[in-house]
């Protein structure tokens, strides 16, 4: 034992113990040499749960999914060099979707920087503006001051990650050899006795009385709508429905709002707006005087276009994190306050009996007719087209299940075909940067928190993150993956690129012709190809009770999928015009 090893051990023990005291319960470790002391110390901690993922990109998204589902800060640890760069996609997603990650990267000491040392690169501010904060940690030293320094930066990192708006932070640890700390006796036995733990308290932003009264006045007796995009806050669901009923306003609810599957059916929740907001003849009858938007922008493009072209109205965006999430730049009033506070205070202050019943009835009649058509079409569909897959998931998912939704076509199909239901289904997706990478790993991370967990994903997105399946095999995780295999980029069939047949398939369709049964075998997953509605039901039912990884593949045709969507939209448009 050397003095260096003892100093290293005490310094890192102080840092790691403070992470745990501040609320960290899990750490995802990517193996490497320079990060050895941090990895060993984390493994030695008596209450810190560690997961080891050999692929850094997968590890980043696994941590993201776990933090997203648990709403707790999760630690990521890797060695120096390109290992840290592989965390970048997950860091970007965490930043844009406000997920608390604490990224720890090991580094060469200062004397080995910029001198051509192996596995060394400039890691200072590696993630740029995609993290809330960066700290290049000091080298360990034998002093009480440095132990306080380590604990202080540990508490600060958790605080910054968790403070609204939540997000990732990056701490870079330069470490000198030798890299093996002292594990006997346990470095955590007496830790914390010399130095106090930092207690962190949070508050919610509120509005002053004059701002509240102004907003109440602007909304009283007006024709308004709530627009609720991705927002993972269960505590908002019932208060929002109650306020909407009091005002007589519809709630245009994105699948990730939680309002389509929070355990109750309410007519104020509008779930088919994506279909009827396409129709110019209908739009004139649905022009509001007030819009109040919560969460990020919904996935629906027709909804976005409609909101973008509303003029002369009061448009509130409720944004407690001051992130200015208003891509259409329609806001007239930016509200920086806690969402639950706003809902409660408006409920208390809004006068009774000022609503226009005909306004809400117009929305609900359109929505009910569109929903009837969607449900009827799906009930009469006997083949496993993409809409039918989502419709069957809606019917078959058990109460309190989790559903992680892939980007590109899956989230849009869920928007169209997963209408409101009186089951509690927790829907999650990576809608920060909307990438198709890392989705398998994110779902596996979320499966640590929610069970049973299902993943609806496209074939290209699944291919992107097959490495992530190793975590399911290694830790015997329970996840059911439904692959919608349309042999390529199905979303592009709906975009203008589809009108360029000369290059469409080679540049956008990108058929892979992969047989995923071999991927299932490689990672010890139960595989089933569903060729009929009955076989899909059988596979989902079996997977609901099976422990481990299940992969259900459904092969579809992207050209038929586009035609089916268009036929459905046309049928809805015709039916809605007949209502007037």
From Swiss-Prot:
Binds 1 thiamine pyrophosphate per subunit. One of its GO terms (molecular function) is thiamine pyrophosphate binding. SUPFAM superfamilies: DHS-like NAD/FAD-binding domain, Thiamin diphosphate-binding fold (THDP-binding). It comes from the Bacteria. GO terms for biological process: menaquinone biosynthetic process. Its EC number is 2.2.1.9. Disulfide bonds: none annotated. Its cofactor is Mg(2+); Mn(2+); thiamine diphosphate. Gene3D superfamilies: 3.40.50.970, TPP-binding domain. The keyword Disulfide bond does not apply. It catalyses: isochorismate + 2-oxoglutarate + H(+) = 5-enolpyruvoyl-6-hydroxy-2-succinyl-cyclohex-3-ene-1-carboxylate + CO2. Pathway: Quinol/quinone metabolism; 1,4-dihydroxy-2-naphthoate biosynthesis; 1,4-dihydroxy-2-naphthoate from chorismate: step 2/7; Quinol/quinone metabolism; menaquinone biosynthesis. It holds the Pfam family TPP_enzyme_M_2. The keyword Hydrolase does not apply. InterPro entries: DHS-like_NAD/FAD-binding_dom, MenaQ_synth_MenD, MenD_middle, THDP-binding, Thiamin_PyroP_enz_TPP-bd_dom, TPP_enzyme_TPP-bd. Keywords: Magnesium, Manganese, Menaquinone biosynthesis, Metal-binding, Thiamine pyrophosphate, Transferase. Homodimer. Belongs to the TPP enzyme family. MenD subfamily. Catalyzes the thiamine diphosphate-dependent decarboxylation of 2-oxoglutarate and the subsequent addition of the resulting succinic semialdehyde-thiamine pyrophosphate anion to isochorismate to yield 2-succinyl-5-enolpyruvyl-6-hydroxy-3-cyclohexene-1-carboxylate (SEPHCHC). This is 2-succinyl-5-enolpyruvyl-6-hydroxy-3-cyclohexene-1-carboxylate synthase. It comes from Listeria innocua serovar 6a (strain ATCC BAA-680 / CLIP 11262). The gene is menD.
